[in-house]
Amino acid sequence: MTVRVRIAPSPTGPIHVGNVHTALFNWLFARHHGGKFILRFEDTDLERSRPEWEQVIFEDLKWLGIDWDEGPDIGGPYGPYRQTERLDLYRKYAQQLLESGHVYKCYCTKEEEDADRREAQAAGRPYQYKGRCRDLTPEQQAAFEAEGRKPVLRFRVPRGEVIRFNDLVRGPIEVPTDSIGDFIIMRANGMPLYNFAVVVDDVTMNITHVLRGEGHIPNTPVQILIYQALGFPVPEFGHLGHMTNPERGKLSKRKGEAAIRDYREQGYLPEAMLNFMSLLGWTPPGAESGREFLTKEELIREFDLSRVTKASSVFDRNKLNWMNGVYIRKKSLEEFAELALPFVVSAGLCTEEQARARWDWFKEVMAQVHERVETLAEIPQHVDIFLKDEIEMDEKAARKFLTEAVKPFFQRVSEGLRSVEWSVPAIEQLVRSIQEEMGLTPKESFQPIRVAITGRTASPGLFETIYLIGRERVLERMAPYC
């Protein structure tokens, strides 16, 4: 048997971190077993589904390194891969269930069902459809049709039975059918509801394993009933734990925590995200001794559902930042500079052409922050002093360090910088010799220069900073205090 798994996002917005986590585990499972990973779109929300969101989902999954074997963009033997292009299939199987007696036409009005819900709520019991249309005679159906009522199709849930399945993550689960009301599979307008459409999709795409979030556990017995009614084998199910923030709440869209695109734009590396997310709910071999860093190849080779926990996992941004910083530091300086460039350009510090025209210098600038940043988005705030003509001055620091007392020292340093060989050792020798001659401490001499040329009290090494800012800019920035 060839393992076939799928991920089925809705193209109504950027793909959520939780959906990406589910996609990752499905992808790892498929690749580990030499199987197929299928991407399809649940796009029946016609008002909100957009082609541009499909492109965003494609891009974000590819950015992470998650590829698919069949999908809307590349096709495959079991397409189409959008639900809106599969409506004839749903109608075909709905008709089959209608003819076999597993579903029936329901003419109940919204008002009738709302009244039933209020009654159930008042009685303190969960709502279940009462079965008002479960056994209508042909004459009763004809009368409703004559009134102009358009029927939905409801599944006839058998009574007094137990649905059993062995969850690949949680073990045996049993659900009595008496706890499941007769459910709608097709709306009056001919559009399928989720549980019916997903079964038809999985059946016709030969899906063998369904790995998804624990929120789908209540859907599983409903879907098993549909599989059985259609006469198809039931796939194996595994339900993954929820993902929460450290406060055990949902990841926040407002804080830029919910969409994978947010992390991409904030300067996280795809390999760091992939590694970090693989550890949410899965324990790799060797974790007991602190093993946390795994390559994509190691993840594929070692992924096993037996090491997946049913407990919810905590998306700890601090740990992600730390892990991303480690991955950044593993990059060569050339690689780091290439990764940094788009963030520097988007911050308006320079154009790509300007950076590439002085690429060796640009790399030297990036070397000053290579060991300091945890995300690529942090880079501009550290390197703006090298790239901007004007700097923002910390007024408190200026009042403290740029006093009348520094003028003689600044005058001598500026004079020396005009003619000194422009190298870090020569600059350092010049400044230190003047400092020593004038009997100044490093704090009395170095910190004023740093504040004057960077506008702040913290920067990379002072002499490297002077060298990289450049002779002309350094002299311009020191001039007001000479």
UniProtKB/Swiss-Prot annotation:
EC identifiers of the protein: 6.1.1.17
Cited InterPro entries: aa-tRNA-synth_I_cd-bd, aa-tRNA-synth_I_codon-bd_sub2, aa-tRNA-synth_I_CS, aa_tRNA-synth_I_cd-bd_sf, Glu-tRNA-ligase_bac/mito, Glu-tRNA-synth_I_codon-bd_sub1, Glu/Gln-tRNA-synth, Glu/Gln-tRNA-synth_Ib_cat-dom
Similarity comment text for this entry: Belongs to the class-I aminoacyl-tRNA synthetase family. Glutamate--tRNA ligase type 1 subfamily.
UniProt-recorded name of the protein: Glutamate--tRNA ligase
Database matches in NCBIfam families: gltX_bact (TIGR00464)
A Gene Ontology molecular function term of the record: zinc ion binding
Motif placement: 'KMSKS' region: 250-254
Gene Ontology process terms (BP): glutamyl-tRNA aminoacylation
Cofactor: Zn(2+)
Oligomer and partners: Monomer.
One Pfam family per UniProt: Anticodon_2
Organism of this sequence: Symbiobacterium thermophilum (strain DSM 24528 / JCM 14929 / IAM 14863 / T)
Record: residues binding Zn(2+): 106, 108, 133, 135
Motif ('HIGH' region): 9-19
Biological role: Catalyzes the attachment of glutamate to tRNA(Glu) in a two-step reaction: glutamate is first activated by ATP to form Glu-AMP and then transferred to the acceptor end of tRNA(Glu).
One GO term describing the cellular component: cytosol
